[in-house]
């Protein structure tokens, strides 16, 4: 029988306390709060430092160790099908809610009076994101460049190709696979060390947010924020909840299982900060490494449910606030554009806001200057986006793993029932995401 660790040693508790302290510091001592921004930035940079090698190790080890290469293509196909269906539902829900609630109605803002210079940089970056450009950008100019820039999709593409090539080498490639497995141990140990700094990162990021923007900015456009937050909660509990029930598990138990990762995302407003831990958690939940390695990184670009809800709601809100008429044709056009543009929301600084700028420019009917209306509260809305995206990718991983019969359902139910152990718990040798002993044989 193991002794339960004290509450104060739990990362879950430490991050909650850090967020609370950050809010108080930012509110009562705003200058101090703003000065703490480097804590949050530094923590996120530390995480990003190891994301690329962790994705590489996980994907290569998973693919190279598979017996049947057809299953990789099958997994990718099912994942993209799931992503497209669920993200479309998210876009539709956002569109329906914003039309029913109409949070921007009655504001009567003249778009010509808005300061478009505040959003000029976002519009420029958004216009640079074409569909063809996005697809071509998945192919790295150099291998080193993909890792140096930390571009998730470029690293993922190279990792898949490398994994296939290593598998084709058979026994000759086994020493390379052994090295990659051991290198993965080192990377996940680094993550464990970095995660001890998560409370400091959450404190700094939250103190800066409240100190820089103030609690008052939460009230100014509160109706849109409340509407968006409620919609995200309903989407998770109803839509994702129904998907989970249909596949034999509970979304509430899944949320409880990834509670530490959700708190880290809440504190940093960056879903990337939880990516390495999600790779470990989903594999521990019973999904095969090959599935986890493909679905989680790909989902960070193609399965952004929270961002999808935000994009439709924000676009129509701007139309309502500026008294810009949008009939059913305009809204269908908006939806079709977002079905494409929303897939480019990852790997770009200020991703959701930039994609929104690109969408408004592409639709043409909506005033791009209207982005200035939500620029001040976008930082607060990004937290709900990131949390919803994280839960969505966790659900996607389990569902796709079940579809391709790469899910240990007994392990799934056992882990969900227990609520999950902290990742720093070393009672099992595979807690670092890689099994001890020799690498899997390559046939």
Curated annotation (Swiss-Prot):
Lipid bilayer topology: Multi-pass membrane protein
Chief location category: membrane
Annotated spans, Disordered: 415-443
Keywords: Cell inner membrane, Cell membrane, Membrane, Symport, Transmembrane, Transmembrane helix, Transport
Short name of any one Pfam family annotated for the protein: SDF
Database matches in SUPFAM superfamilies: Proton glutamate symport protein
Cellular component terms (Gene Ontology): plasma membrane
GO molecular function, one term: fumarate transmembrane transporter activity
InterPro entries per the UniProt record, alphabetical: C4_dicarb_transport, Na-dicarboxylate_symporter, Na-dicarboxylate_symporter_CS, Na:dicarbo_symporter_sf
Coiled-coil boundaries: none
Coiled coil in keyword set: no
Gene3D superfamilies: Sodium:dicarboxylate symporter (1.10.3860.10)
Membrane-crossing residue ranges in chain numbering: 10-30, 46-66, 78-98, 130-150, 152-172, 199-219, 224-244, 291-311, 332-352, 354-374
BP-aspect Gene Ontology terms: L-aspartate transmembrane transport
Domain of life: Bacteria
Cellular localization per UniProt: Cell inner membrane
HAMAP family in the cross-refs: C4_dicarb_transport
Function recorded in the entry: Responsible for the transport of dicarboxylates such as succinate, fumarate, and malate from the periplasm across the membrane.
Protein family: Belongs to the dicarboxylate/amino acid:cation symporter (DAACS) (TC 2.A.23) family.
Protein name: C4-dicarboxylate transport protein
Gene that encodes it: dctA
